[in-house]
Structures are given as C-alpha cells and as structure tokens.
C-alpha cells in the first residue's frame, strides 16, 4: 500500500482517484500532479513503482499544502476572523451560517437541535 503525506492510498483504485483521499487534493489537483510527473491516470496504485510514488510525494510536498498544515491554516484563518470581530467571525462564534443564508426556517445543521420555547 502506497503511503503519501501520511495517508495510506487504497491499492485497487486508480491513482487519480486515490490521491483525492489526501486532505487538500481534489480530482483536478491529482490530475495536475500526475501530468507533472508523467504518470497515466489509468494506472492503479498497486502498479506504481517506488520511484513513481516518491516523485508524486515530492511534487505534493513542494507544490501543495495538505493534511495537518492545511487543517491548521483553515482553523487559524477562522480564529483570526473571530479575533478581528468581523461579521463572519461573529457568525462563526455564534454557530450560525456564515455565507448569508437565511435562518428563519432552516439552518438546522449550523444551529443544532431545535430548542423549543414554551408558552403558557
């Protein structure tokens, strides 16, 4: 099993789809990586040689921010928005939708379980 950026890639999948198991790499990025290192998209992970795996890993390391570093950057970006006191930061802090969605009826995913306010 090939291990790139701390992620075990599934053996039976095609390389272009297996690379998407790495956080921060989507289908387009994986295709760009494979083009850069001259590896066929149709190749399976189990058919990759050690040289090919190392060339993919090197390309990812020098060109992309993935896994822990990317997660840390996203978290720090959200934290900085909250520290600045921007509108987006306030919405993050309150656990409400950030991108302008209405909250009158929906937004249950962000708001959590319904809290019923009873009346007498």
Curated annotation (Swiss-Prot):
Keywords: Ribonucleoprotein, Ribosomal protein, RNA-binding, rRNA-binding, tRNA-binding
Pfam families named in the record: Ribosomal_S13
PANTHER family recorded: 30S RIBOSOMAL PROTEIN S13/40S RIBOSOMAL PROTEIN S18, SMALL RIBOSOMAL SUBUNIT PROTEIN US13M
Any one of the GO BP annotations: translation
InterPro entries in the cross-refs: Rbsml_uS13_C (IPR027437), Ribosomal_uS13 (IPR001892), Ribosomal_uS13-like_H2TH (IPR010979), Ribosomal_uS13_bac-type (IPR019980), Ribosomal_uS13_CS (IPR018269)
GO terms assigned for molecular function: rRNA binding; structural constituent of ribosome; tRNA binding
Spans through the membrane: none
UniProt biased composition (Basic residues): 107-120
Span list, region Disordered: 92-120
Domain of life the protein comes from: Bacteria
RNA-binding found in the keyword field: yes
Record's protein name: Small ribosomal subunit protein uS13
């Amino acid at each position: 099993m090939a291990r790139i950026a701390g992620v075990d890639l599934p053996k039976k999948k095609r390389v272009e789809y297996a690379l998407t198991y790495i956080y921060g790499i989507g289908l387009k990025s994986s295709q760009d990586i494979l083009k850069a290192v001259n590896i066929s998209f149709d190749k399976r992970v189990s058919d990759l040689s050690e040289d090919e795996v190392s060339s993919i890993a090197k390309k990812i390391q020098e060109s992309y921010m993935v896994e822990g570093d990317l997660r840390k950057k996203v978290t720090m970006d959200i934290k900085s928005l909250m520290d600045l006191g921007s509108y987006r930061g306030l919405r993050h802090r309150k656990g409400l939708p950030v991108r302008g969605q209405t909250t009158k009826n929906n937004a249950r995913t962000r708001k959590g379980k319904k809290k019923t306010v009873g009346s007498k």
